[in-house]
Structure formats: structure tokens, C-alpha cells
Amino acid sequence: MRLETVRQILDCRVLVGDDRLDGEVSLGCGADLMSDVLAFIKPNALLLTGLSNVQSVRTADIAGARAIVYVRGKLPDKEAIELAKETGIVLLATRFLMFEACGKLYAHGLRGGSELQEGFSDVGGAPLRSTV
């Protein structure tokens, strides 16, 4: 999904990278716990988070994420903005709650990492299976 499409769907404000909205993301990851992000995110992903400090940008950079959408109207601090400029990570902000933002993107075709992983399992190691 193009970042411009993400911007339109979530009615985002562009904070960093308005010249890179033609870039593509291949999946989404919504989390506030950066250890979860590091465990589950894949390169070229879109990170949705309410964590608005520099750690969100550091984590996205380490994980190879292309962009961050800050949810719930959160805005990153100056240090996070500067690091995003240095690393080339696009920063967007939306008023939507994380659940709503992820749902809107999913409804428009963006998928999460678990759908792209073979044999994805929970913490206990047993494969997740639908009971429906």
C-alpha cells in the first residue's frame, strides 16, 4: 500500500517525509510495546503506535520499517522528528485510535505479519487455529 493511500485512509497529518509518500509498505504492525514490535514487525512495514518518543523511531529504524503512524492524536517529540529525518522514516499522525486505524487499513487490504508468516504461533508454541 502506498503511504499516500495510508495518509488518505487515516486522514493523517504528514510530520516528516511528505516527499516520500509514493513509497510502499507491505504490511502493518500496531503496538505500543516496542519489544513486541521488534518481535513481530518485518522490513518495509508500517508501524502504528501511540508511543511518541524517540524510541519509536529507533525501533522502526532497527526493524527496517518504512513509516510510523502515531495514533490517538499523539505527536512525536523533537528528538524523534530529528531522528526520523536522519533515518528517512516517514512520520504520520492520525486522530483515530489504534484499533480503528488498524481496522481501516486492514479493510483496505493492508495485512499484518501473522498472515504472512508460515506456522505463526502464540507464546506457548502451539499453532494458532481458528475454532470457527
List each model region and its residues:
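N-terminal, charge-rich interaction modules
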Residues: 1-19
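Catalytic, metal-anchored helix/loop core of enzyme active sites in primary metabolism
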Residues: 3-4, 85-89, 132
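Feature captures the catalytic cores and cofactor-binding loops of soluble hydro-lyases/lyases
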Residues: 22-23, 27-46, 50-120
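Internal, active-site/partner-interface "lid" segment
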Residues: 115-132
